């Protein structure tokens, strides 16, 4: 059971928006006392708003929130917090927040996000922040409905008389409290659902029969598919066996192909070996003609060759070391020469520095003379002169400090007098500003008063106009009431309700007729389904017949007649196509065999071309250094031979000439005669002859080296060309064989192309036959479908005839469409009448609202008239305030004139003092500038002399001598290095000559080794060729061909048998595909659909029966619950009335609930009072006190009966309009109720009253120790104070 714990209020009504006021609710009784207007009712309003989210009545425009004008703010935030325990005794906190903003002309109230917290196990969990969710969650947590919280538990004082309100409002509130409309709507929905489900059950029965037929047909198709799959499995196993035999046959063919390929390869190898032998023989002959054959063994030649290589390597290493040595010497020579050039430059620089120092001495002497004359110095010593200059600078600085100090003292005194005068002026200015500010405020106030006066000035005229408007409004209200009485809206409403009752009775009769008609709806539904199926299948049959005829004419080029036997005709055509296919497939297999043989020969030719081309590339790479033809190479070899011979002769002649000239000189010196002519020579001729011989001897070595080098080049070229000649022979032979092989390949490719053309023709004919066979097979399947459809139509006709016999003839007399049409018209009429009733009610409500609005507007006008009277009084007061303000302004203006006259009197004296101050400042600046200039000049002289002295201390002559000596040593090193380079060059020339002789001897040994290697290669090639020729004689080439033909025949036969089996398998697969397509398209999930429909039909039938039972039980339960609750409520009301009411005019009161329509589930409510046997409506016949007492008692009874989970009840001013006896009686009854319910843990009675005597009568000190007093503080803010009883 739920209960409330405490609540805090902030910013609601008269409660302050800056602080919270809290109240704790006790069990079983909480008393709240306060004077009228203190804020007691606000507590009930906050409880109702926190639990339901409903604002109190008449709170539009933010009246529920603390007024911003009172607190002087533009925006006020309000908040209500309620702590309570839900039905599970879990503590929860509900927080609701509001905001009221005031703008220039409007107010805006805004509901902010709230919060619903749950506190469990010391953890805080937020359930929701949305206001809409709080409105539903809080009543749910308290265990009562929102209507019960609104109308019973936390009922507002202004709405507390609702039990005696007009019938419509009373019915609405009782229906909300009992939640009767919800149950009535649920019951109507259940019954409507039951009727709909009965119709659905009948349709489901027909659908179930149809699904059963589809299921049986699907099972037949699945059986046929299963048999076809078994046949396909057998065929595939047979095909696998054939595939193994075909693979084995292909393997044997491959082995024979490989044997044939090996034979051809051996022939190619033999031809290649013959060609290679010819090339080697040619090379051997050429090599013998160009070399000297030695008798040494190959091992000796190899050793000699390797020794040559070592010697050459040693000589080359020695040559490289000498070259490196020469390079190092050249680098050293270069660096020494660069250093020599640098030293020469340094000597020039030092010479320049010596000249600069001489000039600097002259400048220094000139400056010293200038200083002596400028400062009148008698010293001759340089140091003494610099000391005198420093003293002069110090003296100038000291004189400046003394003079500037005196001027600054005078300046400070003048400045003090200036500041005093300015302070007095500032005081006067501030005074003027204050008077001006005060004057401006006075003028602003006066302006505002005049503005307000101008605004209120038309009020007098408005008051007269409003008086006339109030009189017109009274007349308008009177006319509206007369018009409302003339329309007779209540009589019109009764008329429409009578017509609506008649229409609903006729609809009930039609529902009974439809129920009786639906007993045989299952048979009619089946007939309708069968007729639709027959129509659909007939249309499909006609379409398929047309498709069959058009397809047959397209395939066979002639039309099929209606009386033809489709199956026999198609079987004949299929057999004819099968025979043609067999013939063409055999021809295609034969062509494929021939083509395979051609491809093998082409492959061998291509391989041979590739080998020859690759061999040619290898040979050509060896000749990449020679770009000429074979003929040009022969002529070039011959030319080289003659040129080599000439160069050898020339070299021999040169070697002989050197000996000859030396012998001639010897003879000339000894015998003084010429060696050739033996003529004697005199001294002059002898001298000339010796010089000539020496010049010839000097020329011969260089000429011999030149001729030797050229001879070496010619010999190397001759050797390269001699080696290339046999390779040219091989390339010519390869070109010839390439040409022959390409010609053969071209012929084979031409034959293959012819075979391909023939094969394409046969393949085209095969494709045509395959397409025709496929079309014929499709036609066979179409004929089969047509037969199935004809059989299905005959079955439907038989089943339809059986159903027509079962259908009774009496059903035909009722036309269901006409009945439904009449029901539709009645439904439209019922809707129209209901709209008319609603429209009449709306019109009545509108008239009443119009009258109420007019009355409200009239009251507002009267209120405005009163406000205008107040404004006229305010206008008179404003006139007085304006006059007083004018007098104040005149007084302030006089004061302003007095102060202004005193301003500016000290201005001339102030100007004189400021001029004097500026003059003193200028004198100080001038003195400082002069002193700084003299000090800077003296310091500059001293600085320049110090710098020049530093430069003159450097010793340059010693450095000059050192560099000159170093330059002489470096020059000597350069000459020594140059002589070493010349010696190294002589050694390099001698070493080159030794290397040339070694290479000539090495080449001859290498040629002998190469000749012996070629001889061995020739012997190996001849041996291998003889072996291959001997092998060829043992092979029988014809046997290869016979065995190949046998294997090809077997391969073709196996493929033909395999193709036949695959064709049959293809036909079966097509048949299975068609059957599966039929299953997927027409019978997809037939079993599942039948099973689901069977389950659905059975379960829907059973569920519909249970739905009827549930509707009947719910109807009875609703009526019993309502009757039981009303009896209990009336019992409690009777008991409380008799115990409370002290008068004798009314024995008791009760609540009557009269049934409104058929079914006793809709009620009209009224409160009656009983006197003896008479029972009268209490509304309009009771006094104000009886009205208050009756409403309290009814609320107590409703809370007792319906608030089982929530024992809370709040009474706001329960003693209103009660006399003293009834107050005492009500207090005693409340005390008795508290005493009886105090054992209930969650019972909480909240009493709010201004009557403290009533509190004592309730016997409050027996149930609680404290009570709460609500009052206003000094700021007129409501506050809650806890006080002891």
UniProtKB/Swiss-Prot annotation:
Coiled-coil boundaries: 295-365, 630-668, 698-726, 727-809, 814-902
User: What residues does the Zinc-hook domain cover?
Assistant: 630-726
Q: What is its main location?
A: nucleus
**According to the record, how does the cofactor bind?**
Binds 1 zinc ion per homodimer.
Q: What does this protein do?
A: Component of the MRN complex, which plays a central role in double-strand break (DSB) repair, DNA recombination, maintenance of telomere integrity and meiosis. The MRN complex is involved in the repair of DNA double-strand breaks (DSBs) via homologous recombination (HR), an error-free mechanism which primarily occurs during S and G2 phases. The complex (1) mediates the end resection of damaged DNA, which generates proper single-stranded DNA, a key initial steps in HR, and is (2) required for the recruitment of other repair factors and efficient activation of TEL1/ATM and ATR upon DNA damage.
Could you say which protein family the record assigns here? Answer: Belongs to the SMC family. RAD50 subfamily.
Domain-level remarks:
The zinc-hook, which separates the large intramolecular coiled coil regions, contains 2 Cys residues that coordinate one molecule of zinc with the help of the 2 Cys residues of the zinc-hook of another rad50 molecule, thereby forming a V-shaped homodimer.
Q: Kindly provide the name given to this protein in its UniProt entry.
A: DNA repair protein rad50
Organism in which the protein naturally occurs: Schizosaccharomyces pombe (strain 972 / ATCC 24843)
Task: Give the lineage.
Answer: Eukaryota, Fungi, Dikarya, Ascomycota, Taphrinomycotina
The gene name reads rad50
């Amino acid at each position: 059971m739920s209960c409330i714990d405490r609540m805090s209020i902030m910013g609601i009504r008269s409660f302050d928006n800056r602080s919270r006021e809290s109240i704790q609710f006790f069990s079983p009784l909480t008393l709240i006392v306060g004077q009228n207007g203190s804020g007691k009712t606000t507590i009930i309003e906050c409880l109702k708003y926190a639990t339901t989210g409903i604002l109190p009545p008449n709170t539009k425009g933010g009246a529920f929130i603390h007024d911003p004008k009172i607190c002087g703010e533009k925006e006020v935030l309000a908040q209500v917090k309620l702590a309570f325990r839900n039905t599970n005794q879990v503590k929860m906190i509900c927080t609701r927040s509001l905001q009221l903003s005031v703008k220039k002309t409007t107010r805006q109230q805004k509901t902010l996000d709230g919060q619903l917290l749950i506190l469990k196990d010391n953890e805080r969990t937020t359930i929701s922040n949305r206001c809409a969710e709080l409105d539903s969650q809080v009543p749910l947590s308290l265990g009562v409905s929102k209507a019960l919280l609104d109308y019973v538990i936390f009922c507002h004082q202004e709405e507390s008389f609702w039990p005696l309100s007009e019938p419509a409002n009373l019915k609405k509130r009782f229906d909300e409290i009992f939640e009767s409309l919800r149950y009535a709507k649920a019951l109507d929905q259940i019954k409507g659902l039951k009727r709909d489900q009965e119709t659905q059950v009948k349709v489901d029965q027909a659908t179930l029969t149809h699904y059963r037929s589809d299921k049986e047909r699907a099972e037949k198709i699945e059986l046929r598919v299963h048999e076809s799959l078994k046949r396909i499995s057998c065929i595939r196993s047979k095909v696998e066996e054939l595939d193994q035999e075909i693979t084995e046959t292909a393997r044997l063919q491959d082995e024979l192909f490989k044997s044939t390929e090996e034979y051809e390869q051996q022939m190619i190898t033999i031809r290649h070996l013959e060609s290679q032998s010819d090339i080697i023989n040619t090379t051997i002959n050429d090599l013998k003609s160009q070399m000297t054959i030695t008798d040494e063994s190959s091992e000796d030649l190899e050793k000699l060759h390797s020794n040559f290589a070592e010697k050459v390597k040693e000589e080359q290493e020695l040559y490289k070391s000498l070259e490196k040595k020469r390079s190092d010497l050249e680098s050293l020579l270069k660096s020494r020469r660069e250093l020599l050039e640098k030293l020469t430059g340094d000597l020039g620089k030092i010479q320049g520095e010596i000249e600069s120092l001489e000039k600097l001495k002259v400048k220094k002497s000139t400056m010293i003379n200038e200083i002596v004359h400028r400062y009148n110095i008698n010293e001759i010593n340089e140091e003494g002169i610099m000391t005198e200059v420093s003293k002069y600078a110090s003296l100038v600085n000291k004189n400046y400090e003394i003079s500037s100090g005196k001027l600054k003292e005078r300046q400070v005194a003048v400045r003090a007098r200036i500041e005093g005068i300015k302070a007095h002026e500032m005081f006067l200015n501030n005074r003027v500003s204050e008077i001006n500010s005060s004057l401006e405020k006075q003028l602003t106030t006066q302006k505002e008063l005049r503005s307000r006066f101008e605004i209120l000035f038309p009020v007098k005229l408005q008051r007269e106009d409003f008086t006339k408007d109030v009189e017109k409004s009274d007349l308008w209200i009177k006319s509206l009431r007369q018009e409302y009485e003339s329309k007779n809206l209540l009589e019109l409403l009764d008329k429409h309700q009578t017509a609506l009752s008649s229409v609903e009775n006729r609809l009930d009769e039609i529902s009974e007729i439809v129920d009786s008609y639906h007993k045989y709806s299952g048979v009619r539904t089946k007939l309708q389904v069968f007729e639709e199926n027959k129509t659909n299948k007939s249309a499909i049959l006609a379409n398929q017949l047309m498709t069959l005829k058009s397809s047959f004419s397209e395939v066979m080029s002639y039309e099929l007649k209606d009386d033809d036997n489709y199956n026999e005709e198609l079987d004949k055509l299929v057999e004819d196509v099968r025979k043609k296919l067999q013939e063409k497939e055999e021809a295609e297999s034969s062509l494929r065999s021939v083509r395979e043989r051609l491809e093998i020969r082409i492959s061998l030719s291509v391989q041979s071309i590739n080998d020859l081309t690759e061999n040619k590339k290898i040979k050509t790479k060896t000749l990449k250094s020679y770009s000429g033809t074979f003929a040009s190479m022969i002529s070039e070899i011959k030319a080289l031979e003659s040129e080599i011979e000439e160069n050898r002769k020339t070299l021999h002649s040169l070697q002989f000439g050197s000996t000859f000239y030396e012998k001639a000189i010897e003879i000339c010196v000894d015998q003084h005669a010429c060696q050739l002519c033996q003529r004697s020579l005199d001294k002059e001729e002898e001298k000339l002859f010796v010089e000539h011989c020496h010049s010839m001897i000097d020329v011969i070595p260089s000429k011999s080296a030149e001729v030797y080098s050229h001879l070496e080049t010619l010999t190397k070229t001759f050797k390269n060309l001699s080696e290339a000649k046999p390779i040219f022979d091989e390339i010519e032979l390869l070109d010839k064989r390439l040409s022959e092989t390409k010609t053969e390949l071209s012929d084979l490719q031409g034959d293959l192309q012819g075979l391909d053309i023939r094969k394409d023709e046969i393949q085209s004919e095969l494709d045509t036959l395959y397409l025709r066979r496929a079309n014929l097979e499709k036609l066979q399947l179409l004929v089969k479908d047509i037969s199935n459809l004809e059989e299905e139509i005959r079955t439907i006709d038989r089943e339809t005839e059986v159903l027509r016999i079962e259908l009774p003839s009496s059903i035909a007399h009722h036309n269901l469409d006409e009945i439904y049409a009449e029901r539709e018209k009645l439904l439209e009429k019922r809707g129209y009448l209901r709209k008319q009733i609603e429209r009449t009610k709306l019109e009545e409500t509108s008239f009443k609202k119009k009258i109420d609005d007019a009355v409200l507007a009239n009251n507002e006008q009267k209120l405005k008239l009163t406000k205008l009277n107040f404004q006229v009084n305010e206008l008179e007061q404003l006139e007085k305030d304006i006059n007083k303000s004018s007098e104040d302004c005149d007084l302030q203006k006089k004061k302003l004139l007095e102060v202004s006259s005193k301003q500016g009197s000290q201005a001339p004296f102030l100007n004189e003092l400021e001029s004097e101050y500026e003059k003193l400042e200028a004198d100080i600046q001038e003195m400082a500038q002069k002193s700084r200039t003299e000090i800077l000049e003296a310091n500059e002289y001293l600085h320049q002399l110090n710098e020049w002295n530093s430069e003159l201390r450097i010793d340059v002559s010693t450095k000059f001598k050192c560099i000159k000596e170093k330059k002489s040593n470096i020059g000597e090193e350069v000459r020594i290095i140059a002589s070493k380079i010349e010696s190294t060059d002589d050694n390099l020339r001698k070493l080159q000559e030794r290397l040339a002789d070694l290479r000539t001897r090495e080449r001859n040994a290498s040629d002998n080794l190469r000749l012996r290697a070629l001889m061995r290669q020739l012997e190996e090639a001849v041996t291998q060729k003889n072996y291959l020729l001997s092998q060829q004689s043992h092979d029988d080439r014809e046997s290869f061909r016979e065995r190949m033909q046998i294997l090809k025949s077997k391969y073709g036969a196996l493929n033909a048998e395999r193709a036949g089996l695959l064709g049959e398998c293809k036909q079966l697969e097509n048949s299975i595909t068609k059957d599966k397509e039929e299953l997927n398209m027409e019978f997809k999930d037939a079993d599942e659909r039948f099973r689901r429909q069977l389950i659905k039909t059975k379960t829907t039938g059973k569920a519909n029966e249970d739905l009827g039972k549930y509707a009947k039980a719910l109807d009875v339960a609703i009526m019993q619950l309502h009757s039981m609750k009303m009896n209990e409520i009336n019992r409690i009301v009777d008991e409380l009335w008799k115990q409370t009411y002290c008068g004798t005019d009314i024995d008791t009161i009760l609540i009557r609930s009269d049934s409104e329509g058929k079914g006793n589930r809709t009620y009209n409510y009224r409160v009656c009072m009983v006197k003896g046997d008479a029972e009268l409506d209490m509304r309009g016949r009771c006094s104000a006190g009886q009205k208050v007492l009756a409403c309290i008692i009814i609320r107590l009874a409703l809370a007792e009966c319906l608030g089982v989970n929530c024992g809370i009840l709040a009474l706001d001013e329960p003693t209103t309009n009660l006399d003293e006896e009834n107050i005492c009686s009500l207090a005693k009854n409340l005390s008795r109720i508290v005493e009886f319910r105090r054992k209930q843990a969650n019972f909480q009675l909240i009493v709010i009253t201004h009557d403290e005597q009533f509190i004592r009568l309730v016997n409050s000190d027996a149930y609680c120790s404290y009570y709460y007093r609500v009052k206003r503080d000094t700021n007129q803010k409501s506050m809650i104070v806890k006080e002891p009883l």
